């Protein structure tokens, strides 16, 4: 019976992995027409840079996308980037970082660590540098922040974590009390294990809740109560409430800030406006 359960779990993981890969959207055509867009290579990975054609602000955002560490950029990510650029004038750098199960966090940080260093070295000292991500990308963003803090590299002026996945072990008992209409705990745990590899579950690079907090500053977390990642995000924020501003929305689902069609709801609209306000102020 136990063997059958794990076979079924592996089958379900294969289905969601396939669906997330085949659902990956191509770049929207209007990105090329309406924005300054470039696609570069860094250590054989694509790096997308998108910015406004006019009214550019001295703001650079490094954005790490979510997708449970197995999913690529989706159409809603690009729509979110376009909205952010239109409303802030910022330039957004989006790396196509390696994904599980072919890769673990070790391969991800082999690319993200030198890429981060390159970006901050090329920035003007007066440039507002913002690190941002959603879901798994938000967890990766925090881990990248912690890693660069240990390396004494320039840290972001602000870090914005949207519906962050901060602990792939998913062992917080409060998780089971969350009425999440989107995320499935068994699949998340399996994705997290694939990303962590053999020994990664003990590393803060996989689970930033285990990481150093002494250099944290200007960290903003937006999370909804109907998101099973909320309990760990809230716990982390409470433990570091002098360094982390936790913005919680009652009844909001996972990644509500990114869903443009849901901005008709009060919390989705307010969450998006809050992100814009953090970027600009």
Enumerate the predicted regions with their spans.
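Domain-scale detector for complete catalytic domains at protein termini or as standalone homologs
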Residues: 1-134, 138-281
């Amino acid at each position: 019976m136990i063997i059958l359960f794990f076979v079924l779990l592996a089958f379900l993981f294969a289905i969601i992995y396939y669906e997330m890969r085949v659902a990956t959207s191509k770049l929207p055509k209007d990105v090329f027409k309406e924005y300054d867009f470039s696609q570069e290579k860094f250590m054989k990975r694509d790096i997308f840079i998108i910015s406004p054609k006019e009214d550019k602000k001295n703001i650079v955002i490094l954005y790490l996308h979510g997708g449970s560490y197995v999913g690529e950029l989706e159409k809603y990510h690009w729509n979110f980037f376009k909205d952010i650029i239109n409303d802030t004038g910022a330039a957004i750098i989006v790396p196509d970082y390696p994904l599980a199960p072919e890769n673990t966090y070790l391969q991800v940080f082999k690319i993200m660590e030198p890429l981060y260093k390159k970006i901050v070295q090329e920035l003007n000292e007066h440039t507002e540098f913002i690190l941002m991500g959603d879901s798994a990308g938000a967890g990766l963003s925090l881990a990248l922040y912690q890693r660069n803090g240990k390396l004494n590299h320039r840290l972001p002026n602000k870090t914005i974590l949207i519906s962050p996945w901060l602990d792939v072990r998913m062992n917080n008992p409060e998780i089971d009390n969350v009425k999440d209409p989107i995320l499935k705990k068994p699949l998340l745990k399996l994705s997290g294990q694939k990303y962590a590899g053999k020994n990664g579950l003990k590393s803060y690079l996989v689970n930033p809740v285990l990481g150093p907090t002494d250099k944290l500053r200007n960290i903003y977390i937006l999370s909804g109560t109907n998101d099973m990642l909320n309990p760990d995000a809230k716990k982390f924020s409470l433990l570091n409430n002098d360094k982390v501003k936790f913005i919680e929305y009652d009844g909001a689902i996972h990644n509500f800030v990114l869903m443009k069609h849901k901005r008709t709801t009060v919390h989705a609209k307010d969450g998006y406006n809050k992100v814009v306000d953090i970027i600009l102020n």
